[in-house]
Amino acid sequence: MGQCVTKCKNPSSTLGSKNGDRDPSSKSHSRRGASHREEQVPPCGKPAGDILVNGTKKAEAATEACQLPTSSGDAGRESKTNAEESSLQRLEELFRRYKDEREDAILEEGMERFCNDLCVDPTEFRVLLLAWKFQAATMCKFTRKEFFDGCKAISADSIDGICARFPSLLTEAKQEDKFKDLYRFTFQFGLDSEEGQRSLHREIAIALWKLVFTQNNPPVLDQWLNFLTENPSGIKGISRDTWNMFLNFTQVIGPDLSNYSEDEAWPSLFDTFVEWEMERRKREVEGRGALSSGPEGLCPEEQT
């Protein structure tokens, strides 16, 4: 996501010789037959005439030692910073592509274009997973912070990058603890925060239950949703407690509902549901019995 070019600069000061820094006022020993004069000491070493065993001049070796390159840690940090800046720039461009003209957020129209580019339907499970990762406060809206933080959370800064994360998000949502978090998020996601709602409208709750259980449909879900659909007058809304407890209900109560007890601390709506469902099943069994016996209690073969 970006490359860093590190420039290595030599230190401005020179190092002393092997025996330490010389006093500027001191003179070197005179050579044979020559007058006293100041010795010219090459930077970072002894005079150039000194040769190491491998043929390298000591002055050259010492000078090379003085070239202090930027450490790999510094280079790595700089490269990471550059990569983050490049990623932020791409996120900014992506966000501006869908944001509303007046509000600094992606609203309904922008969300439709966003989902269209992702090749997903706005009402499908993958969009719910994306909203979960973005920690969106309400449906059909991503604020700037939600969008940027969410994309960082899934390590994506492009349409292709987001699409590439969907398989791992689907797998993650199958984990029990992750699904519980997703499930509880979904209730809050369905509320109209601007109106200060504290419970879900029945129709919204039904739609969200179908959506959140896309990958793991509990046996009792269809009966529960039928109950909610056929009893509109008696159910005004779904509270947070009822929503949260329904997940526990699907995990501990068997499909035949035989281990359900009204004495346990279940929401009262569950008592009504179990009573309604057991009565419905009873009528269903009686209806099948009447059909099998035929008119006037005769078996079909006896009627011929």
Swiss-Prot record:
Gene Ontology CC terms: cytoplasm; nucleus; perinuclear region of cytoplasm; plasma membrane; ubiquitin ligase complex
Residue ranges of domain DCUN1 in the record: 86-278
Name of the featured protein: DCN1-like protein 3
Domain notes: The DCUN1 domain, also known as PONY domain, mediates the interaction with different cullins. The DCUN1 domain mediates the interaction with the N-terminally acetylated NEDD8-conjugating E2s enzyme leading to the NEDD8 transfer from N-terminally acetylated NEDD8-conjugating E2s enzyme to different cullin C-terminal domain-RBX complexes; the neddylation efficiency correlates with the DCUN1D5-cullin and DCUN1D5-E2 interaction affinities. This domain is also involved in CAND1-, cullins- and RBX1-binding.
Purpose of the protein: Contributes to the neddylation of all cullins by transferring NEDD8 from N-terminally acetylated NEDD8-conjugating E2s enzyme to different cullin C-terminal domain-RBX complexes and may play a role in the cell cycle progression by regulating the SCF ubiquitin E3 ligase complex, after UV damage. At the cell membrane, can promote and as well inhibit cullins neddylation.
Keyword set includes Cell membrane: yes
Covalently lipidated residues, kind N-myristoyl glycine: 2
PROSITE patterns per record: DCUN1
Annotated gene: Dcun1d3
Cellular compartment(s): Cell membrane; Cytoplasm; Nucleus; Cytoplasm, Perinuclear region
Keywords, in A-Z order: Cell membrane, Cytoplasm, Lipoprotein, Membrane, Myristate, Nucleus
GO molecular function, one term: cullin family protein binding
Residue segments, region Disordered: 1-87, 285-304
Quaternary data: Part of a complex containing DCUN1D3, CUL3 and RBX1. Interacts (via the DCUN1 domain) with the unneddylated cullins: interacts with CUL1, CUL2, CUL3, CUL4A, CUL4B and CUL5; these interactions promote the cullin neddylation and the identity of the cullin dictates the affinity of the interaction. Interacts preferentially with CUL3; this interaction triggers the relocalization of CUL3 to the cell membrane where CUL3 is neddylated. Interacts (via DCUN1 domain) with RBX1.
Pfam families with a match to the protein in the record: Cullin_binding
